[in-house]
């Protein structure tokens, strides 16, 4: 009986466009169209589902940062210093880690006090360390995987965030970096495209060219007032859009509309 059927919503957390090319969309559509609604992390994902014949309502949502993660962080500490560039996440080629090193190498030749910190572990870590050693690049630090307060300290000690991943859904690490007031330098991938404001939040581009990102970062390194302005904007924006309590409340309000039908 239809009254016995459970109302179901679907949250699609990742999306592989290459896989989608050869997927069984007849089967996928038949099942997804049974859902009351679907949540995805970017407008591109939503557009692809619609193009493939999904008729259920599709809503954009976000990954989230736990409210407690930023407890004790004082935004006033961001005074425009630009010395430590940070990357966090899996150490894999597809995360743009080599491009990150090359971007830093370009900048390091001009700004001698710059440092680069990699937070994370992955299959590419030994090769990346060897790459840095072979190129004789100084002041690159690898922390390995960190959690909790140790991870939080790295965000606090960083000044800029460089994330050149090839593909993404909605990278939580970028949202975390924003909450901690870091200017973001990243690529047009996944859900970042839907909200990122070039100039106000840092820099976003489709490019994978390290020279492009090095050039984009120079005005920030040389202008403490610009760094400070972006730090404040990013932290406030992220607190009002990406902390768990905000994301969950919006999620619940959307679902309530369907429950009340």
Model regions and ranges:
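Donor nucleotide-sugar binding/catalytic pocket of nucleotide-sugar-dependent glycosyltransferases
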Residues: 7-13, 17, 29-72
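A conserved mid-protein helix/loop that constitutes part of the nucleotide-sugar donor-binding site
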Residues: 83, 87-106, 116, 123-127, ...
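Nucleotide-activated donor-binding/catalytic signature segment of Leloir-type glycosyltransferases, i.e.
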Residues: 129-146
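A short, well-ordered alpha-helix in the C-terminal region of glycosyltransferases
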Residues: 212, 219, 226-241, 247, ...
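Aromatic "clamp/platform" in nucleotide-sugar-dependent glycosyltransferases that forms part
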Residues: 166
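Conserved acidic donor-binding segment of nucleotide-sugar-dependent glycosyltransferases
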Residues: 197-199, 203-210, 219-224
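Short hydrophobic beta-strand element within catalytic cores of glycosyltransferases
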Residues: 183-186
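Short alpha-helical donor nucleotide-sugar binding micro-motif in glycosyltransferases
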Residues: 145-146, 153-158
């Amino acid at each position: 009986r239809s009254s016995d059927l459970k109302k179901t919503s679907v949250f699609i957390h990742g999306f592989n466009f290459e896989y989608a090319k050869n997927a069984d969309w007849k089967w996928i559509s038949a099942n997804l169209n049974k859902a009351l609604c679907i949540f995805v992390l970017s407008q591109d994902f939503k557009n692809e589902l619609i193009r493939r014949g999904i008729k259920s309502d599709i809503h954009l949502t976000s990954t989230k940062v736990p409210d407690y993660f930023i407890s004790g962080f004082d935004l006033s500490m961001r005074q425009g210093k630009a010395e430590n560039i940070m990357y966090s996440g899996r150490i894999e080629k597809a995360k743009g880690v080599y491009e990150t090193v090359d971007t830093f190498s370009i900048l390091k030749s001009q700004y001698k006090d710059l440092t680069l910190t990699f937070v994370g572990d992955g299959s590419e870590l030994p090769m990346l360390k060897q790459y840095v050693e072979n190129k004789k690049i100084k002041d690159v630090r690898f922390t390995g995987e960190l959690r909790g307060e140790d991870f939080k300290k790295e965000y606090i000690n960083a000044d800029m965030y460089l994330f050149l991943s090839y593909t993404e859904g909605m990278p939580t690490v970028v949202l975390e970096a924003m909450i901690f007031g870091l200017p973001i330098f990243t690529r047009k991938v996944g859900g970042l495209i839907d909200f990122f404001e070039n100039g106000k939040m840092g820099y976003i581009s489709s490019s994978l060219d390290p020279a492009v990102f090095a050039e984009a970062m120079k005005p920030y390194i040389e202008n403490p007032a610009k760094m400070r302005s972006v730090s404040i904007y990013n932290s406030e924006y992220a607190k009002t859009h990406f902390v768990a309590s905000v994301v969950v409340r919006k999620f619940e309000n959307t679902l309530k509309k369907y429950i009340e039908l």
